Regions:
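Long, acidic (Asp/Glu-rich), low-complexity accessory segments flanking structured domains
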Residues: 2-194, 207-246, 310, 317, ...
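A cross-family signal for N-terminal binding/gating loops and helix N-caps
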Residues: 142, 203, 260
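Structural recognition of the beta-strand scaffold that forms the well-ordered cores
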Residues: 162-165, 197-201, 217, 252-256, ...
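Intrinsically disordered, low-complexity acidic segments that are enriched in bulky aromatics
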Residues: 221-275, 281, 288-289, 298
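Well-ordered, non-membrane alpha-helical segments in soluble/globular domains
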Residues: 230-240, 266-279, 363-377, 414-427
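A generic structural motif
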Residues: 254, 280-296, 397-398, 453, ...
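Structural alpha-beta junctions
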Residues: 272-288, 335, 383-390, 471-484
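Aromatic-lined glycan-binding groove of carbohydrate-active enzymes
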Residues: 299-409
Length: 488
């Protein structure tokens, strides 16, 4: 069977046109005693000077190089099947143009990871990222997000639940720990700097009967997050505050749950958080509603997966403290907290590695549900705040595990789930039918909701996070069409 022709999906807000196609032998190949790796490296070194090799290089290896001018326009959010077919061990060099500027990418990309398209002019206006899926000969292109400050592209009036938000499951479990306990590759600080905006935190009060004690030990189920000694919630909060000070356009959503083997109660946890942590309204959003982005820039938004002490239930005009997720549906494919503020996929009991396909199916189903939502956008902050409270969070946990099976520990699950979700987001998320316009409200804003991941950032691989963030593009385009200015 012949390999499929090249398909290009433009997931950016910018119209693109494929202008030229070049072919040359891949770096793995050698012919006529010529080191192709050396040649291709020299070719890619012409970042701002040339889009083609020099005459001597071309003469030296002419039989493995060809160039063709083409004109293939690709509108924002359009998927286009071309007649460009791969040929053996060749690399395809694709040059795109937008607004008179050209950008280039070689496929397959190194290590089959995302790559930033090379601008062919000084001071380029745009930055694009490409993800190439060799199995399908499929290239997805999206606007590169500034990972540390990506919320700066969105207006204050944006409903927080309308965003595509990457998150981590058991976020502080990056320390040396039991392999069934560890869920993350890198620190919370590094997670935040690379775009993570949802943190999943599990704690156990250290001295619950002492009102003056603030100690909250970070745990994962019955286990500490580190084998080298207790790690504390206070230190984690300080890291988040430092990040928000450096990036005031951002907000961090923090889900907090009581776990561990201690005898503390939910009510005691709620008292500790209220008395020792969340009193400062410039740092914390403690309302029991989903806010607009502008209400919480520079703040931590608390989702409460624990019960409140009776003394705190009268806060916020009787609605209580924090966004209510106390009635979290357990091990669910599609559940709703009784508060109505959160719709969640959190199926985590994978008895066998063969059940991972079921987990993947539940995850993509939740992505599809989130993509169909359409946010109500208003330039009036009061209206925006009220409308934001009506749109629930779609929360989608990609995590799962089985304590008793090593091939179902968090890292092994992530090895299988994460690449499939990258593939889904690039090829299928918020796809349109032939009768639908790519920017039509009938297909929704294309949001992912909050996607909660394990083991992102492994060996510097942030492709899953980048793909999630790319799905904010439709919302950004809708906001760009409105007259009000974006946040500074």
């Amino acid at each position: 069977m012949a390999p499929p022709a090249l398909t290009i999906r433009n997931l950016s807000t910018t119209p693109l046109e494929l202008k030229s196609l070049e072919r040359f032998e891949s770096a793995e190949g050698k012919a006529s005693g010529v080191n192709i790796t050396r040649i291709t490296r020299s070719l890619t070194g012409f970042m701002y000077l040339n889009s083609t090799p020099t005459s001597p290089q071309l003469a030296e290896k002419a039989e493995s190089f060809s160039r063709q001018d083409v004109s293939i326009p690709i509108a924002p959010f359009e998927t286009k099947v071309t007649d460009i077919e791969p040929q053996g061990n060749q690399v395809l060099r694709l040059t795109f143009e937008t607004n008179g500027e050209r950008y280039r990418i070689d496929t397959p990309t190194p290590l089959h990871r995302s790559t930033v398209l090379t601008p062919l002019s000084h001071n380029p206006t745009y930055e694009f990222t490409g993800v190439y899926l060799p199995k399908y000969h499929f290239l997805a292109i999206f606007s590169s997000a500034k990972l540390a400050s990506w919320m700066s592209n969105l207006k204050d009036e944006t409903p927080l639940a309308a965003l595509s938000i990457p998150g981590t499951h058991n976020s502080p479990t990056y320390h040396a720990a039991l392999p069934s306990v560890r869920c993350q590759a890198v620190s919370v600080k590094e997670q935040l700097n690379n775009g993570i905006r949802f943190l999943d935190i599990r704690v156990q009060p250290q001295d619950p009967n002492d009102p003056a004690a603030e100690g909250l030990i970070l745990v994962h189920s019955a286990f500490p997050v580190s084998l080298t000694g207790h790690k504390y919630f206070r230190d984690l909060v300080n890291h988040v505050k430092v990040f928000l000070d450096a990036n005031p356009t951002e907000t961090v959503i923090m889900s907090i749950k009581r776990e561990g083997i201690g005898k503390a109660t939910d009510q005691q946890l709620s008292q500790i958080l209220n008395h020792h942590y969340t009193q400062d309204s410039t740092r914390w959003f403690t309302g029991n509603r989903i806010p607009a982005l502008g209400e919480v820039r520079g703040k931590i938004v608390v989702i409460r997966r624990f019960g409140l002490d009776d003394s705190l239930k009268g806060e916020n005009n009787g609605t209580g403290l924090y966004i209510d997720a106390e009635s979290w549906p357990d091990n669910c494919a599609d559940g709703v907290c009784t508060s109505g503020e959160i719709r969640v996929q959190d199926f985590y009991e994978v008895a066998e590695s063969s059940n991972i396909e079921k987990k993947i199916g539940y995850s993509t189903d939740q992505l599809e549900r989130a993509a169909k939502t359409v946010a109500v956008l208003s330039e009036d902050m009061g209206v925006a705040s009220a409308e934001s409270a009506k749109q629930p969070f779609f929360m989608n946990f990609l995590s799962a595990s089985n304590f008793w099976r090593a091939n179902c520990w968090p890292d092994k699950i992530a090895e299988k789930v994460n690449p499939v979700i990258v593939d889904y987001l690039c090829r299928r998320h918020s796809e349109t039918t032939s009768s639908e316009q790519p920017d039509s409200a009938s297909v929704g804003d294309g949001s992912t909701g909050i996607v909660v991941c394990d083991w992102v950032g492994t060996d510097g691989d942030w492709d899953l996070v980048r793909c999630i963030l790319a799905m904010n593009a439709k919302l950004e385009l809708r906001e760009k069409d409105r007259p009000s200015d974006p946040p500074s």
